[in-house]
Amino acid sequence: MAREFSLKNTRNIGIMAHIDAGKTTTTERILYYTGRIHKIGETHEGASQMDWMEQEQERGITITSAATTAQWKGNRVNIIDTPGHVDFTVEVERSLRVLDGAVAVLDAQSGVEPQTETVWRQATTYGVPRIVFVNKMDKIGADFLYSVGTLRDRLQANAHAIQIPIGAEDEFKGIIDLVEKKTYMYGNDLGTDIEETEGFPAEFAEEAEELRASLIEAVADYEEEMMMKYLEGEEITIEELKAGIRKATLTVDFYPVLVGSAFKNKGVQLMLDAVLDYLPSPVDVKAITGINMDTDEEIVRESTDEAPFSALAFKVMTDPYVGKLTFFRVYSGTASAGSYVKNSTKGKRERLGRILQMHANSREEIPMVFAGDIAAAVGLKDTTTGDTLCAEKDNVVLESMTFPEPVISVAIEPKTKADQDKMGQALAKLAEEDPTFRTETNPETGQTIISGMGELHLDIIVDRMRREFKVEANVGAPQVAYRETIRQSAKIDSKFARQSGGRGQYGHVVVEFEPNEEGAGFEFNNKIVGGVVPREYIPAVEHGIEEALQNGILAGYPVVDVKAALVFGSYHDVDSNEMAFKIAASMAVKQLKDKSGAVILEPMMKVEIVIPDEYMGDIMGDVTSRRGRVEGMEARGNAQVVRSMIPLSEMFGYATGLRSRTQGRGTYSMHFDHYEEVPKSVAEEIIKKANG
C-alpha cells in the first residue's frame, strides 16, 4: 500500500494553552473546517468533539489528549489536544514528546498565564517550534498587542505579529495579514461570509506598514540573503518573507503571532494555513536518536519509510469497545496490522493487532502506518507509556520520557465487598494509563493509598472508577507527600548479633552518611579495604540502607538526597549471612534520628491568584497566614495578579476559601515547584501525628 500523504505534506502538531484559553474550541473549529465534523460542538454546552470522556464534557476541561487526523489543502494534519490544567502536566509532556510543532493558544484578555509558562517551558525542553494564536478577540478586555507583549515579558519569547485584528471585543470584525498584505473582513460569526481584499485598509495602513517592517527586520536576522536585500533597500517578496518566517520558526527561537476568535469562527482557516506554512514536517526535524541495547552504540533513525521501523508509545487508554489502546508515533519505517514488532524497552515480542487512525472518539481501521504517522494499536499486551517499539530483528531504544513524582495522596476504600476486587482492577488499569498516578497498599494498615499531581487529578480518577468501572469508593482526607533528609554528616557503627541455639546471625557495619545535593537522590559507595566485609554481603548492606531510608527516620516519610559510604565492618565465618548484614545496615539508618540533623521537607506550590483590586489586602493576608510568601504582583487588565509560594499542606480546600473571600470573582492556579524544609513547630506536629 502506498502512502496517502508525503512526509513533506504531514504535520504533527499539538494545541497547547492555559485552562480556558479556548483550546478545545480552537481544535473543534480546525476539525470542522478540515471536514472532520459536520456539526460544531461547543465546550460550554458540553458537546465538544475532542473532550470525549464524560467528566470532560461535564467539567468543560480537557483531560486526556485525544489524537485526531485531519486534512487541509492536500496535507495531513495530526492534532493532539493537550490539557491546560496543571494537574495534567504529564499529558502535556507526553504529547510534546511526539510532536513536531505546536500552536500555543492565548486568551486575548489575559495574555500569558501561569500554565502557559509551564507548557511553554516544556515545549522548549523538547525543542518544539511554535506559532501563537491569540484567541477570544471578541471577549471584553481583549487586547492583542498587550498579549504579544506578555509573550516577550513573561516568557522572554522572540514573538512577532504576522497578523493584526481590526477592532476588538464586540467590534472585532476583521484580520489584516501582514505577510501577504491582505485584509479579511467577516460579515457574520459563522465564518461563512468572508471578504478578502488586497492591501491594508486606510485607517490601519500606517500601523500595519510599521509592524510589517519590524517583522521583516526580525526575520532577516535568520536569513542572510534577505538581510542583504533589506539593508540595500530592495523589495522583499511575499514568498521570500514566508520562507524566512518558516526558517526562523524552525530554529525554535522565533514565534509568529496570529489572531482570531475560534468561537466566532474568525481566523481559524488562516491559522491552519500558518500551520502548513511555518510549522515543521517530520522531514524538517532532527532525526531521532536511540541506543542499541546490544552494543550500547547510539543509533540515528532517519524519518523515511525505507529505514527500519521505530516508534514511541506515548499514551495507553482503556477503550470500552476494543480494550487496551496504545497511541504511538512512528519515527521511521513502516508496519502493517497483524505484524510482529519488538518492545525493546521491555525485551518483549508484541503483535500489532489492528491499527486505528483516531478521530476524537470515532475511529477508522487502517492496514498500515508509515514514518511520521500517529495512530493507535490494539493488541499490545506489555507496552506502557514511554516504551519503544522497533523492528523484530532490531534492539533500539529511543529516548524515553521522565515523569514527575506525585505530591498528594488519599486513602481510598470500596463501599461494599463486591467493589473490593473491582477496585483493584480499576486502579491497576488507571495507573497503566497515567504514569503520574500511583496506587499502593499500606502494609501496616492494609489501606489502599492513591497518589497524584493534585486534588483535581485524584477527583477525576475516583470519578472515572465510578463511571467506567462501576466502583463506588469512599475517599479519605488528602495527605501530603512529605520527604525527610539529613543536614549533617554522621558516622554510625551498627552491629547485629543473635545467638539462639545452633547457627547464629552476625553482621557489623560502619557507615558514613552525608547530605547529597538537592534532587540527587540516594548514592551508595563501597569503601571497604582488605575484605573486612566480604564482597558478597555488600549488595545486602546497600539494600538494607535503601529500604530503611524509604521508611523514614523521623516520621516515616522517604529520606531523600543522602550519600552512604560503607567504610568498615566485621563478619563471622559461620554466623554471617546476607540477612544479618541487611538488618545491621537498616539499624544504622535508625540511629540517624539523633545524629544527623534530620529534617522534614514539604512540597511547595507556585500559586498564581487573580483577583479584583478590592480584595488585594485580604488575599495577601491569607497567603501569609498559610505560611506562604508573596513573590510578585502585577496588574492584568482591571484585575491584580499575586504570584506566591505556598506549602501544599496549606492549600487544601483553597478553591472554596478563595471563592467566599472574593464572592466567586477570584481564580487561582498552582503547580508543584520544589521541596523545602518545614519550620520546626510544624515538623513537631507532623512527627507527633505520624508516631501517634
Curated annotation (Swiss-Prot):
<keyword id="KW-0547">Nucleotide-binding</keyword>
<dbReference type="InterPro" id="IPR035647">
    <property type="entry name" value="EFG_III/V"/>
</dbReference>
<dbReference type="InterPro" id="IPR041095">
    <property type="entry name" value="EFG_II"/>
</dbReference>
<keyword id="KW-0963">Cytoplasm</keyword>
<feature type="binding site">
    <location>
        <begin position="135"/>
        <end position="138"/>
    </location>
    <ligand>
        <name>GTP</name>
    </ligand>
</feature>
<dbReference type="InterPro" id="IPR000640">
    <property type="entry name" value="EFG_V-like"/>
</dbReference>
<dbReference type="InterPro" id="IPR000795">
    <property type="entry name" value="T_Tr_GTP-bd_dom"/>
</dbReference>
<dbReference type="Pfam" id="PF03764">
    <property type="entry name" value="EFG_IV"/>
</dbReference>
<comment type="function">
    <text>Catalyzes the GTP-dependent ribosomal translocation step during translation elongation. During this step, the ribosome changes from the pre-translocational (PRE) to the post-translocational (POST) state as the newly formed A-site-bound peptidyl-tRNA and P-site-bound deacylated tRNA move to the P and E sites, respectively. Catalyzes the coordinated movement of the two tRNA molecules, the mRNA and conformational changes in the ribosome.</text>
</comment>
<dbReference type="InterPro" id="IPR009000">
    <property type="entry name" value="Transl_B-barrel_sf"/>
</dbReference>
<dbReference type="Pfam" id="PF03144">
    <property type="entry name" value="GTP_EFTU_D2"/>
</dbReference>
<dbReference type="GO" id="GO:0005737">
    <property type="term" value="C:cytoplasm"/>
</dbReference>
<feature type="domain" description="tr-type G">
    <location>
        <begin position="8"/>
        <end position="283"/>
    </location>
</feature>
<dbReference type="InterPro" id="IPR009022">
    <property type="entry name" value="EFG_III"/>
</dbReference>
<dbReference type="InterPro" id="IPR020568">
    <property type="entry name" value="Ribosomal_Su5_D2-typ_SF"/>
</dbReference>
<dbReference type="InterPro" id="IPR004540">
    <property type="entry name" value="Transl_elong_EFG/EF2"/>
</dbReference>
<dbReference type="InterPro" id="IPR047872">
    <property type="entry name" value="EFG_IV"/>
</dbReference>
<dbReference type="GO" id="GO:0005525">
    <property type="term" value="F:GTP binding"/>
</dbReference>
<dbReference type="InterPro" id="IPR004161">
    <property type="entry name" value="EFTu-like_2"/>
</dbReference>
<protein>
    <recommendedName>
        <fullName>Elongation factor G</fullName>
    </recommendedName>
</protein>
<dbReference type="Pfam" id="PF00679">
    <property type="entry name" value="EFG_C"/>
</dbReference>
<dbReference type="InterPro" id="IPR035649">
    <property type="entry name" value="EFG_V"/>
</dbReference>
<dbReference type="InterPro" id="IPR027417">
    <property type="entry name" value="P-loop_NTPase"/>
</dbReference>
<keyword id="KW-0251">Elongation factor</keyword>
<feature type="binding site">
    <location>
        <begin position="17"/>
        <end position="24"/>
    </location>
    <ligand>
        <name>GTP</name>
    </ligand>
</feature>
<dbReference type="GO" id="GO:0032790">
    <property type="term" value="P:ribosome disassembly"/>
</dbReference>
<feature type="binding site">
    <location>
        <begin position="81"/>
        <end position="85"/>
    </location>
    <ligand>
        <name>GTP</name>
    </ligand>
</feature>
<keyword id="KW-0648">Protein biosynthesis</keyword>
<dbReference type="InterPro" id="IPR014721">
    <property type="entry name" value="Ribsml_uS5_D2-typ_fold_subgr"/>
</dbReference>
<dbReference type="InterPro" id="IPR031157">
    <property type="entry name" value="G_TR_CS"/>
</dbReference>
<keyword id="KW-0342">GTP-binding</keyword>
<dbReference type="Pfam" id="PF14492">
    <property type="entry name" value="EFG_III"/>
</dbReference>
<dbReference type="Pfam" id="PF00009">
    <property type="entry name" value="GTP_EFTU"/>
</dbReference>
<dbReference type="GO" id="GO:0003924">
    <property type="term" value="F:GTPase activity"/>
</dbReference>
<comment type="similarity">
    <text>Belongs to the TRAFAC class translation factor GTPase superfamily. Classic translation factor GTPase family. EF-G/EF-2 subfamily.</text>
</comment>
<dbReference type="InterPro" id="IPR005517">
    <property type="entry name" value="Transl_elong_EFG/EF2_IV"/>
</dbReference>
<dbReference type="GO" id="GO:0003746">
    <property type="term" value="F:translation elongation factor activity"/>
</dbReference>
<dbReference type="InterPro" id="IPR005225">
    <property type="entry name" value="Small_GTP-bd"/>
</dbReference>
